[in-house]
Regions:
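Short terminal interaction segments
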Residues: 2, 85-153
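Extended, charge-rich alpha-helical scaffolding segments
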Residues: 2-90
Length: 153
């Protein structure tokens, strides 16, 4: 059975697996960028930090493009197979030889999502703690000015 551009459903499944693998790799790269971001924040290298933030934006944009391609391919494959465009549905309607790369890619994507979520949480906590410390220092400095002490005498 063939679909768009004379692709067989096996070839379409392979393309879908490749896109999902690319999505996982993009998330893993993004997690690496978040680790670099934390190092740059600690080192106060603001020029490099701005460059890294632009790289993070590109990474997110690339991922969204891959996600749209995944949705398109999954929709086509599901239409050919007569099922919902969910990975579990698609995989259950394919032979094991054809579904294994898809299932493996989906598993890797899930692991990548968990890894990225962990990196976001670590970065978020670091920024929250930094803000709290900054607020504490400012509060202490304000307290000094209200104590009657004057630098001018």
């Amino acid at each position: 059975m063939t679909v768009e551009g004379d692709l067989t459903f096996r070839e379409l499944a392979r393309k879908l697996a490749d896109v999902i693998e690319a999505m996982a790799l993009k998330l893993e790269d993004t997690a690496g960028l978040l680790k670099k971001e934390r190092l740059l924040l600690a080192g106060k290298d603001y020029a490099s930090l701005q460059s890294l933030l632009k790289e993070l934006e590109r990474s997110v944009s690339d991922f969204l493009g891959l996600e749209a391609e995944r949705d398109r391919l999954a929709g086509q494959l599901a239409c050919v197979l007569g099922c919902d465009p969910k990975m579990s549905e698609i995989a259950s309607n394919l032979e094991e030889e054809t579904s294994k790369p898809l299932v493996d890619a989906a598993d890797r994507l899930q692991r990548s999502i968990k890894g990225l979520k962990s990196e976001f949480e670590i970065t978020s906590r670091l920024l929250d703690e930094s803000k709290k410390l900054g607020d504490l220092v400012l509060s202490q400095l304000r307290g000094l000015t209200g104590s009657g002490f004057s630098v001018r005498g």
